[in-house]
Amino acid sequence: MSIEQTLDELKQQLNYHAYRYYVEDSPELPDAEYDRMMQELLSIESEHPELVTVDSPSQRVGGEALDGFTQIQHEIPMLSLDNAFSDEELEAFEKRMNDRLISKPVSLFCCEPKLDGLAVSLLYVNGKLVQAGTRGDGTTGENITENVRTIRCIPLTLQGEGWPTRLEVRGEVFMPKAGFEALNERALKRGEKPFANPRNAAAGSLRQLDSKITATRPLSFYAYSVGVIEGGELETSHYQRFVQLKSWGLPMCEETKQCYSLTEVKAYYKDILKRRDALKYEIDGVVIKVDDIALQEQLGFVARAPRWAIAYKFPAQEELTVLNDVEFQVGRTGAITPVAKLEPVFVGGVTVSNATLHNADEIARLGVHIGDTVIIRRAGDVIPQIVSVVEARRPTDSKAIVYPTHCPVCGSNLERVEGEAVTRCGAGLVCQAQRKEALKHFVSRKALDVDGLGDKVVEQLVDKEMVETPADLFKLSAGVLTVLERMGPKSAQNVVDALNKAKATTLPRFLYSLGIREVGEATAANLAAHFYTLEAIQVATFEQLIEVSDVGDIVAKHVLNFFAEPHNKTVIDDLQEMGIHWPEIKALDESVPQPLAGKVVVLTGTLHKLKRNEAKAALQELGAKVTGSVSKKTDILFAGEAAGSKLAKAEELGVEVMNEEQLIELLN
């Protein structure tokens, strides 16, 4: 199996399990297995940086917004943390930072337990809580303001004085152990299904569409950082910022502590690990941050995490259970994934009943049989893997796992390309399983974004043989849709309206919706920007394709193969006949100068005549690089009303400042 193929499979697996974990709150793997897969992906990408794509799980923070909530945009991305699993990895983290800082090594850390809950953002304007949101995918989250207002420890109005006019507080909503146990006891008495663990209970409670239900749940909150700060200043120490937040009525974890060396950090980790079971809440490690805010800003961020913080995870927890069966699932690209069906076992705070077996090679490596007693590990405390077989306990009636030769859904022959570990069904949309996944992808938020056409609706449409190709979706009428479960006339008409609305799209979205292997959002955008038209992409040669940013040999081959397939050409023609269209992309006139080419600019404050995202896009068209913070590298700060601390910092650094009127004049 080639490196590229290994990466491709890892991305598919990580994206699938991230969706199960972050969106459906129904993980199939222990954290340990997910972390292992992510570490493998990060290791390969570290050794082969040319293979890193914008759509890699390493470049994003997992989790999409649910359809039931309105969405919010995070002004400053809410990133996740990189993980360490040993003292050596912690020491490497410190070395990486000091190598970047050179002149001033890190000498003070702020440490706190890593709570196992749901990350949220609280926005206070003039001391009033005006908005609360989930982390979502890091840039877009769910608006859960009404639910958060029911959490009694979160102040609706800040106490004291001195808080900024706009202050974003970030933290973790969680359910204490005692509250979780009481909640499950009540559920059992009512004959209801109990929650598997406090994290799922917290997430499920916070994402209730009815805030009255949330109000009955024993939720709590600890602040762990700040985001937007405008119209005021905070302390320059991370720990002292906690003290400030506490003085304003925001709860902080009592175990938070400053450590003056890595030796003290290690001692703190061991102490928390020792006292873990005695704590009032579930944790899966400790978070270590550089305490000096100036050093944090100097160190900056990578794509998915800050360079100045790391989560030191606790060791994996293991349990014995029995492998009852193996199911073979079919993914969007035809990849066959064997899923172990386990005797449910409580390990690391989660009841585990499924685990991935990856592929035939992994099954052979483990030598696992149906009926075997196996060791399940949850590394990092949340996602499961079978690490070994207890052969001494193998029953006499155990059965060897027989890998299928035909697709378990459509019956087509399975193929395994030499050098690949993955077995695939090559039937494409003829295969019902692939058809379902392809259609789900086609209508997803980042593709054609068809509101109301969720996974369950798509599955019904395929099961009832109402659609075969994406173009068939646009032939559906409200009357036809009403035969589906839970689809009344109004909902059916809303779906038809959403489908009609989705016909007006963009070339990047359309390319992404086609589900070409390895072509994520960024690659689709790069292809569109390079070739301008779909026709040009369809006839592009291998040599032309690899000239596109982020397109290497493997992606180029996938694109060529996709457009060489007659069936795919037919699907595209049918979609265009159904009215799918997009605006023309105009080639950049290189004779027209870009006045902001190479300039680093920042937008801050309230704009009255422009929307912030429109202003950002317009500035980028003029060649500017738009960033979220002011530094010595900033060339221009565009300041709206109540610009706050960014304006003060720009003036201190001598950065050019323009108001909204000057911004509009420049854009015109």
Swiss-Prot record:
Which key words tag this protein in UniProt?
DNA damage, DNA repair, DNA replication, Ligase, Magnesium, Manganese, Metal-binding, NAD, Zinc
Recorded superkingdom: Bacteria
Q: How is this protein named in the record? A: DNA ligase
Q: What residues does NAD(+) bind to?
A: D31, A32, E33, Y34, D35, S80, L81, E112, R135, E172, K289, K313
- Organism of provenance: Aliivibrio fischeri (strain MJ11) (Vibrio fischeri)
Query: What is stated as this protein's family in its record?
Result: Belongs to the NAD-dependent DNA ligase family. LigA subfamily.
Q: What's one GO MF term for it?
A: DNA binding
Q: PROSITE patterns from the xrefs?
A: BRCT (PS50172), DNA_LIGASE_N1 (PS01055), DNA_LIGASE_N2 (PS01056)
Q: Which residues form the active site?
A: K114 (n6-amp-lysine intermediate)
Q: What is its EC number?
A: 6.5.1.2
